[in-house]
Swiss-Prot record:
The gene is mnmG. One of its GO terms (molecular function) is flavin adenine dinucleotide binding. HAMAP family: MnmG_GidA. Its main location: cytoplasm. The keyword S-adenosyl-L-methionine does not apply. It is found in: Cytoplasm. GO terms for cellular component: cytosol. This is tRNA uridine 5-carboxymethylaminomethyl modification enzyme MnmG. The lineage of its organism: Bacteria, Pseudomonadati, Pseudomonadota, Gammaproteobacteria, Enterobacterales.
Length: 629
């Protein structure tokens, strides 16, 4: 039977991608249905209890700048906040927070249940309704059919998921949840390339059985960082420390002596695991010269006794897991409450997607999260928001939108996936972005909030706060530009006390702030320049914009040069065999990838600058050279 009301957008899966997709589509005014196999696990943290980190924190800030949910949720659920790379430049500084799993899930569910235009329904999906290469609905396990103009697949590790502990394995979407086997079979019938990946998680430890007195503590930062541009440290719950222990030679001997019982090393697991989050077995074998690895003992929540030992993800048998855990300092009497495991699952080649995350072959079908070959809550959330907003635009018969590489880490993520694809779980790093000085955490709102407002994602409150911040930055920069200190003035002595070399000529506030030894905080305590901004976000922007002005201008020039290639469009229907002068390899790759622009074509492995030149000349001769606005 069909459900009585049709929907504009259906989201399948309620993890980090699905919840952002549902919120985005609903915020844009589309009637949205979120289908999940269990309402109680909406926003569930399946692996580590943390949000953010290098590259990942940048994505969270971008999701927030576009009106998304993740940053707000972690501000309400974070039990330890830190700035990573705090001593380095602003481009690579990143926020990270430990999370209380229960509080995080509550924050997500509360937001979903209070979002207008969004209905949540508990049923697993077993089939898609596809008519004339266009998706028009979904079918649940009890045969109930829902119609929609667009469908977003955010199914995580559930597609034909198989859990491995030692040489034993069983079907599962994650520990305690069933897999999605009928939907996996249905998707394999569609003209989409599919492969297998694997990821893993460590055993969870009972905190009451750990001797924390012999372990080093790691505390959060003070003052506490905040994730959301709309957030406040007052929203954070009670803060707690993490603890640090290490593996040792005994640990490594246990692992080496039991590799024949590892499903990875015994050839039972075929899927490729995440390079940047390897299992402890992989770390011991790949870094054989190291006699220890640092392990962070992270609390899972304020009301839980479970500890997440970050760094010992494993699929070894349970008895070996016990030996590994008890070989480490402070853990000699530890008890495991949940075993570690590896999980294999289906993923679909993201090169079969448009930059909007819509399938090139099935109209109205969007993919986001681990189904696209990524790993991590943050990567999933960012894709979910993009897929959700584009599903909403598709439903409303509007053109899709995707950020550029110079505009957002989300742009880098999507371009990497759709252009290059991936053979292993893809994780975001700042090093993946060629314009990372422009793509900082601190300016995510300046880069994206205006765009989010145009798309219908940003509400009035966020828009007003954003404009206040812009005005504060502009006013303060004008004030510093127009306030001068003369070397002969009485106030010069006060200023010179903070400088490595005294003033030799008249200097403005901006001139002084450009000096490496002068911070904004110091500057506004000097009598000519007091008082400063109370808004810490705006003050940070003023300092960064002034200190890095030359570098930022140089990078902007590079972006403008590259933009010429990005704006040169390639016809979707072009058969590259028509282009004389291209090698067979280049023709095959271009026909396979079907890049949307010259810029995207230039990033495909094996496409040479010479091939790009030939293509540009041919397009011009054919009168097919088109540039986007």
């Amino acid at each position: 039977m069909f459900y009585q009301d049709p929907f504009d957008v259906i989201i399948i899966g309620g993890g980090h991608a699905g919840t952002e997709a549902a919120m985005a589509a609903a915020r844009m005014g589309q009637q949205t249905l979120l289908l999940t196999h269990n309402i109680d696990t909406l926003g569930q943290m399946s692996c580590n209890p943390a949000i953010g980190g290098i590259g990942k924190g940048h994505l969270v800030k971008e999701v927030d700048a576009l009106g998304g949910l993740m940053a707000k949720a972690i501000d309400q659920a974070g039990i330890q906040f830190r700035i990573l790379n705090a001593s380095k430049g602003p481009a690579v500084r990143a926020t990270r927070a430990q999370a209380d799993r229960v509080l995080y899930r509550q924050a997500v569910r509360t937001a979903l249940e209070n979002q207008p235009n969004l209905m949540i329904f508990q049923q697993a999906v077993e089939d898609l309704i596809v008519e004339n290469d266009r998706v028009v609905g979904a079918v649940t396990q009890m045969g109930l059919k829902f119609r929609a103009k667009a469908v977003v697949l955010t199914v995580g590790t559930f597609l034909d998921g198989k859990i491995h502990i030692g040489l034993d394995n069983y079907s599962g979407g994650r520990a305690g949840d069933p897999p999605s086997i009928p939907l996996s079979r249905r998707l394999r019938e569609l003209p989409l390339r599919v492969s297998r990946l694997k990821t893993g998680t460590p055993p969870r430890i009972d905190a009451r059985t750990i001797d924390f007195s012999v372990l080093a503590q790691q505390h959060g930062d003070n003052p506490m960082p905040v994730f959301s541009f709309m957030g406040s440290a007052d929203q954070h719950p009670r803060q707690v420390p993490c603890y640090i222990t290490h593996t040792n030679e005994k640990t490594h001997d246990v692992i080496r002596n039991n590799l024949d019982r590892s499903p990875m090393y015994a050839g039972v697991i075929e899927g490729i695991g995440p390079r940047y989050c390897p299992s402890i077995e992989d770390k011991v074998m790949r870094f054989a010269d190291r006699n220890q690895h640092q392990i962070f003992l992270e609390p899972e929540g304020l009301t839980s006794n479970e500890i997440y030992p970050n760094g010992i993800s494993t699929s070894l048998p349970f008895d070996v897991q016990m030996q590994i855990v008890r070989s480490m300092q402070g853990m000699e009497n530890a008890r495991i409450v949940r075993p570690g495991y590896a999980i294999e699952y289906d993923f679909f080649d993201p090169r079969d997607l448009k930059p909007t995350l819509e399938s090139k072959f099935i109209q109205g079908l969007f993919f986001a999260g681990q189904i696209n070959g990524t790993t991590g809550y943050e990567e999933a959330a960012a894709q979910g928001l993009l897929a959700g907003l584009n599903a909403a635009r598709f439903s409303a018969e509007k053109e899709g939108w995707a950020p550029r590489r110079d505009q957002a880490y989300l742009g880098v993520l999507v371009d990497d996936l759709c252009t290059l694809g991936t053979k292993e779980p893809y994780r975001m790093f700042t090093s993946r972005a060629e314009y990372r000085l422009m793509l900082r955490e601190d300016n995510a709102d300046l880069r994206l909030t205006e765009q989010g407002r145009e798309l219908g994602l940003v509400d009035d409150e966020r828009w007003a706060r954003y404009n206040e911040k812009l005005e504060s930055i502009e006013r303060e920069r004008q004030r510093l530009k127009s306030t001068w200190v003369n070397p002969q003035a009485e106030s010069a002595n006060e200023v010179n006390a903070h400088l490595t070399a005294p003033l030799s000529r008249e200097a403005s506030g901006e001139d002084l702030l450009r000096r490496p030894e002068m911070t904004y905080e110091q500057l506004v305590q000097l009598s000519p320049f007091t008082p400063g901004l109370e808004d810490r976000q705006a003050a940070e922007q003023v300092e960064i914009q002034v200190k890095y002005e030359g570098y930022i201008a140089r990078q902007q020039d590079e972006i403008e040069k590259q933009q010429r290639n990005e704006n040169t469009l390639l016809p979707a229907t072009l058969d590259y065999r028509q282009v004389t002068g291209l090698s067979n390899e280049v023709i095959a790759k271009l026909n396979d990838h079907k890049p949307s622009s010259i810029g995207q074509a230039s990033r495909i492995s094996g496409i040479t600058p010479a091939a790009i030149s030939i293509l540009l000349v041919w397009l011009k001769k054919q009168g097919m050279l088109r540039r986007s606005a």
